[in-house]
Structure formats: C-alpha cells, structure tokens
Swiss-Prot record:
<keyword id="KW-0378">Hydrolase</keyword>
<dbReference type="InterPro" id="IPR010126">
    <property type="entry name" value="Esterase_phb"/>
</dbReference>
<dbReference type="GO" id="GO:0005576">
    <property type="term" value="C:extracellular region"/>
</dbReference>
<dbReference type="GO" id="GO:0016042">
    <property type="term" value="P:lipid catabolic process"/>
</dbReference>
<feature type="active site" description="Charge relay system">
    <location>
        <position position="154"/>
    </location>
</feature>
<comment type="similarity">
    <text>Belongs to the AB hydrolase superfamily. Lipase family.</text>
</comment>
<comment type="function">
    <text>Specific for poly(hydroxyalkanoic acid) consisting of monomers of four or five carbon atoms and for P-nitrophenylbutyrate as substrates.</text>
</comment>
<feature type="signal peptide">
    <location>
        <begin position="1"/>
        <end position="37"/>
    </location>
</feature>
<keyword id="KW-0964">Secreted</keyword>
<dbReference type="InterPro" id="IPR050955">
    <property type="entry name" value="Plant_Biomass_Hydrol_Est"/>
</dbReference>
<dbReference type="Pfam" id="PF10503">
    <property type="entry name" value="Esterase_PHB"/>
</dbReference>
<keyword id="KW-0442">Lipid degradation</keyword>
<keyword id="KW-0732">Signal</keyword>
<protein>
    <recommendedName>
        <fullName>Poly(3-hydroxyalkanoate) depolymerase C</fullName>
        <ecNumber>3.1.1.-</ecNumber>
    </recommendedName>
</protein>
<dbReference type="InterPro" id="IPR029058">
    <property type="entry name" value="AB_hydrolase_fold"/>
</dbReference>
<keyword id="KW-0443">Lipid metabolism</keyword>
<dbReference type="GO" id="GO:0016787">
    <property type="term" value="F:hydrolase activity"/>
</dbReference>
Length: 414
C-alpha cells in the first residue's frame, strides 16, 4: 500500500500553502462510499497543508463529548476509512469523528506526507491543517478539549505519531496502526528505509525526536496504542518496537512491559508509569499483513467492515483503542456499581447506579488516572491534584446536571 504509493505528484505551490482563512466554514453533505453520510467542512482554517476535512456527527450528542481524528492510508479516502468502525462506535458511545483527507495535488497516491519536514513540524503544513480541523470542531460543537484523540493507518499512522509529538497539548491519546516513530524519515528517500527494513535508534534518541516536536512542553503527554501485523511486508513490524521505544522514553518510563497477555488470541503488552497508569500499549496481530484490524458483527466489541486494507482478523482495533482512550468503557480504571444493597467492583467498565440520586455513575481511580481516562480536563486535574494528591484514589460522580464528572456526590461542580 505505502511503499509503491509514497511518491509525491508535485510540490505544493506557494498559493496552496498560503490559502486564505474565510470567516465562516462552508458545509457540504457528501456520501460517496461512506457507511454513514459524512459532512465536508470547507474553509476550516488557513489550511496550509491543503487537506480536506470530513466529519461524522452522531445524533443526540451530549455536551463536552470526545473527538477522534481518524487518518486514512494511501489510496484511501475519508469515506473508505469509515470501514474501520469509528463512525459506528461514535454513534453508540457518543463521540465525534473527523476524517482528514489527502488530495492528489499534494501526493499522487493520497498518502499523508509524513516524511516532509514542512508537513510534520508544529505550526506548519499538514500537521497544522489537522490541528485546525480540531479547532473548528471545538468552535462548532461541544468538545471536551481534554478528550481529543488521533489514530490512523499506514501513512495515516505515521502522521498519527507526528500529531502526538507536535501537538501533545491537543491530543490526549494516539493510536498508529502499521506505522512508525515520529521523524523516522525526513525525506522521500529515507521514507523507504524507514518503512523497511526500518530504522534502529536508542530509546533516548527516539525520545529526543518526539520531545523536539514541541520543544519546552511540560504538560500532559498523549498515551499511545501501537498496532502492527506480524506479517506486514509494507511497513516492517520492527517499526512497532521502535515506536514503543520512542514513546516510553518520551513518557519517562522503561521498555519492560508491566502487562503481557492476549486479547482475542493476539499478544498485548502494556507499559505503565510508576503509579500504575497505562501510557503505552501494543497489539501484535499474528499473521496479519498491512491494514487496520476489524471484526465485523453486532457484538459489543465488534466493529468495522472488511475491505481493501481493512482486514477481518476477529478483533476490532477501533473498539480496543477506544477502550484504551477511555471513551469506550472505563479506560482501565476500577468502577463501583451500586444496586440496592449489593456493591460490585469490576475493571475497565463504567456502569450505572440504580439508586435514586443526583449522579448516575461513580468510578474510583487516582486523580491522574481520571485525567487519562478523560473524565476531567487539565484545569480540573490540577484542582483535584492540589486538593487530594495526584496519585490518591478518589471517587468521581457523573452528574447529568453538569454533563460531566465531579468529586462531590451532591453534584456540585469541582
């Protein structure tokens, strides 16, 4: 998919790089081959990368909802990448989805230009265009700024690590599928080497590249879920380990997994912080080639539609990525469910109380884990951290009257 399609058709013209910002976005409804009709948003920003923006807006959206940015692979379109299952999951779990789309004028095979310095630098090119799409969503919908995530396949996966490194202040989580580390390549020639056999650097060297994406930044960094097929002959599986090395070092943790298990029969590893917060995870899909793993069906953990580079392997990557982000289920924390006089504690789920009270859900975790799971924003994180301590386990309560979480059972704001 990627190796034969990475060549750029033409370098951008100065005119395209300096496209104008219009006062109001133009909205166009399109369907194409989309499972759900996507809406195109034009004039969403200065758009220096000359990308197109499509969005999926589920019905009945609550205030302060999450946002997922999903980046297609080479030769694909926004509509085609809906087959990954994100729109359907957004309908069920109530989050918005933005699908950036490459144009052939930028790259003849519609690959995001993850190897071009002018497109992978903060404040420039395609990276800035994608960030402006997020800004547009925040301006026009009720988006929780602490629950914005990015994922992608192949060239879109490489661009995913670009966004994680250059905009850690925007994205709370990232999930590259069949991609590699940030700045694995900075030219078309080096891109081929990066893809296969791959580039070997020390964790510290990779981490320095990621930190250089936004020099001097000291805020929360995005957690990352890294997926790869063991039989991927387009982007070598070695890239998965290099990405682990980059982002574990970026987070200041070691490269020894704290959890090694299987999910759906496939190897899964988790790398945690000193206080037990999952920061990096990997899924290695044994025997899978180059593509996004899906599991078509109607089960709670099933999603996606098989197609070109959308591979039915009986595990839906989008579902498990959503769990890791904390926008599907409990994001790996502990939840207490009360029904009558019976209290049950379970992991990785968020459940509803049946008692008559102002709140409808309660879950206990450290203040840091509440933030990682997306229940509180940065301001609330700092308030609660100062109030209780960042590694202190506290209950939070979901209150419909607040359309969000609070530390007070009477539903007073944080």
């Amino acid at each position: 998919m990627l190796a034969k399609q990475i060549k750029k058709a033409n370098s951008r013209s100065t005119l395209l790089r300096k496209s104008l910002l219009f006062a109001a976005p133009i909205i166009l409804a399109v369907s194409s081959s989309s499972v759900y009709a996507l809406t195109q948003v034009s004039n969403f920003g200065t758009n220096p990368g000359n990308l197109q923006m499509f969005k999926h807006v589920p019905s009945g959206m609550p205030a302060n909802a999450p946002l997922v940015v999903a980046l297609h692979g080479c030769t694909q379109t926004a509509a085609a990448y809906e087959a990954s299952g994100w729109s359907a999951l957004g309908n069920t779990h109530k989050f918005y989805v933005v699908y950036p789309q490459q144009q052939s004028g930028n790259n003849s095979n519609k690959c995001f230009n993850w190897f071009e310095p002018g497109d992978i630098t903060r404040g420039q090119g395609e990276a800035l265009s994608i960030k402006q799409m997020v800004d547009n969503m925040k301006a026009n919908h009720s988006i929780d700024p602490s629950r914005v995530y990015v994922t992608g396949l192949s060239a879109g996966a490489f661009m995913t690590t670009v966004m994680a490194a250059t905009y850690p202040d925007v994205f709370a989580g990232a999930a590259p599928i069949a991609g590699g580390p940030y700045k694995c390549a900075t030219s078309m020639t080096s891109a081929f080497t990066c893809m296969s056999p791959g580039v070997d650097k020390t964790p510290a060297a990779w981490g320095d590249l990621a930190r250089g994406g936004y020099s001097g930044y000291n805020g929360p960094k995005p957690k990352i879920s890294i997926w790869h097929g063991s039989s991927d002959y387009t982007v070598a599986p070695a890239n998965q380990n290099e990405t682990v090395e980059q982002f574990t070092n970026y987070h200041g943790i070691d490269q020894t997994p704290d959890v090694s298990d299987t999910v759906g029969g496939f190897p899964h590893k988790v790398y945690k912080s000193a206080n037990g917060t999952p920061l990096v995870e990997t899924y290695t899909i044994t025997g899978m080639g180059h593509g996004t793993p899906v599991d078509p069906g109607t089960g709670a953990n099933q999603c996606g539609t098989a197609g070109a580079y959308i591979l039915d392997v009986n595990v839906c990557s989008s579902y498990y990525i959503g769990q890791f982000f904390g926008i599907i289920g409990g994001g790996g924390t502990t939840t207490t469910t009360t029904s009558g006089n019976v209290t049950t504690t379970t992991a990785a789920t968020t459940t509803t109380t049946t008692a008559t009270q102002g709140y409808t859900q309660t879950t206990s975790a450290t203040v840091t884990n509440h933030y990682v799971a997306g229940r509180i924003n940065v301001t609330q994180y700092n308030v609660l951290g100062a109030r209780y301590g960042y590694v202190t386990t506290i209950p939070l309560y979901y209150c419909p009257s607040l359309s969000g979480w609070t530390d007070k059972a009477n539903c007073s704001p944080i």
